[in-house]
A protein has these predicted regions:
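Glycine-rich catalytic cores of cysteine/serine-nucleophile enzymes that process amide/ester linkages
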Residues: 25-95
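Second-shell loop/turn segments in exported
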Residues: 31-35, 93-102, 117-125
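Stable alpha-helical elements in mature extracytoplasmic
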Residues: 40-43, 93, 97, 105-112, ...
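Bacterial N-terminal signal peptides
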Residues: 8-18
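Sec/Tat signal peptide C-region and signal peptidase I cleavage site
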Residues: 18-24
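Activation targets extended, charge/polar-rich intrinsically disordered C-terminal tails
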Residues: 26, 111-190
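Bacterial N-terminal signal peptides that target proteins for export
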Residues: 1-9
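Short hydrophobic/aromatic-rich motifs at helix boundaries and adjacent loops
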Residues: 81-85, 103-109
Length: 190
């Protein structure tokens, strides 16, 4: 009798767990890459997880860059594109901060990425629409305060550190632990 009751309770508990919604969330990470070797300074984001409301999971980076590198970028607007950074590039970059997005914030981030993907060409401007501007607009879509200070718009790391400082309380409340802020990830994806 006792075994039957235990089995029945275990089965009911299992059914409750199976019918409960799974906890899922999309995390956004903001990365920078410094000048060195063949690398230009760069900023990009990484999205990983699944929306709480369901939908397909995401595990992808997004950065804004020139379509073709040439001296023309120094003279004025050139063709620009949103691209996915290779895993090897992500692994050699510095994650400045990560936090969980609500489904609403996630939708706004995706809309911003889509907007920048469909900008009329030429869309990249070193002074008005570069990778730092892109991650700044994504950060705003994610609900962060952003100051587009001219002296930081060509300095990805400094810009992201300024965004992190402006939003320290928000980042702490939304799941970023102090130890995770500004640390590198292992060689695998975030």
């Amino acid at each position: 009798m006792y075994r039957s009751a235990v089995f029945l309770l275990a089965a009911l508990f299992g059914l409750c767990l199976a019918s409960a919604p799974a906890f899922a969330a999309v995390e956004i990470s903001f990365y920078s890459r410094e000048l060195g070797g063949n690398n230009f300074p760069h900023a990009f984001i990484y999205l990983k997880g699944q929306p709480d409301s369901g939908g397909p999971p995401i595990d992808k980076s997004f950065g804004f860059t020139v379509k073709s590198l040439s001296p023309a970028v120094l003279m004025g607007p050139v063709g620009g594109k949103v691209m996915n950074e290779p895993d090897s590039y992500v692994a050699k970059s510095v994650r400045q901060f990560t936090f969980r997005l609500t489904d609403e914030q996630y939708g706004a981030v995706l809309a911003t990425i889509e907007e920048w993907s469909n900008k009329p060409q030429p869309s990249y401007s070193l002074n008005k629409a570069n990778c730092v501007h892109f991650v700044g607009k994504v950060a705003q879509a994610a609900g962060l305060r952003v100051e587009f200070r001219k002296e930081l718009m060509k300095k990805p790391r400094s810009f992201l550190l300024a965004v992190k400082a402006l939003n320290a309380e928000v980042l702490a409340r939304s799941g970023t632990t102090p130890a995770a802020i500004g640390t590198n990830l292992p060689q695998s994806r975030p």
